[in-house]
Amino acid sequence: MTADEVQYALTYSQNSPFYFRSHYVVPNVHYGLGFNHELDLLVISPVTFIGTEVEIKVSKGDLKRDLEKKHHHFDFRIRQLYFAGPRTLEGAFHEYAPKEAGIITVIPQVVCGSTRYYCSIRRNAKVNKSFIPFKPKEIEQLLRLGNMRYWSLFGKQFKRKNNGKNDQTNS
């Protein structure tokens, strides 16, 4: 299973706690909001502005390397931290993920010729009781970053599809 598959499962599966139709979800957040590390997924409640970080791991080695990082996934705006990945890593998550982090596993299943992903919270995340909800200006910036990310990706896919033809951008 790839990181993209896990990300898809976490955001597109209606059984996921981070379904994109009910949360603000932006991938790979690093710059623009003052984080000291990159967040694989930043999930924010549109009502309470409470933030959750999701760290995606697809191998035991990747999970072990995370232990060497200095930031330890802490930010005062993050209420909960989850580690997410394939169900086959559940044992490694329990062994190597920080004890305050929740664990979400993903199982792909082929149904009628198409793959569906099922997310399961295997351990609830502990709540950072000193967290501070995001401010409206930060939400605005996050949505701006998500918008920029979408249109950058759209442009790359468009160029790939059209082999660079009809490129009107000269910047």
What are these language model-derived features?
Residues D4, Y8-Y19, A97-S171:
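Non-catalytic C-terminal interaction segments of nucleic acid-processing enzymes
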Residues E5, N36-L39, H73-F76, Q80:
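Short, well-structured alpha-helical interface segments that form or flank functional binding sites
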Residues S16-G34:
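A short acidic/basic microdomain associated with nuclease active sites
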Residues V29-Y31, V43-S45, V58-K60:
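Short, flexible loop/turn elements at secondary-structure junctions
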Residues G34-E53:
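Active-site beta-strand-loop-beta-strand hairpin of nuclease catalytic cores
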Residues G51, V58-I107:
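Catalytic cores of nucleic-acid endonucleases
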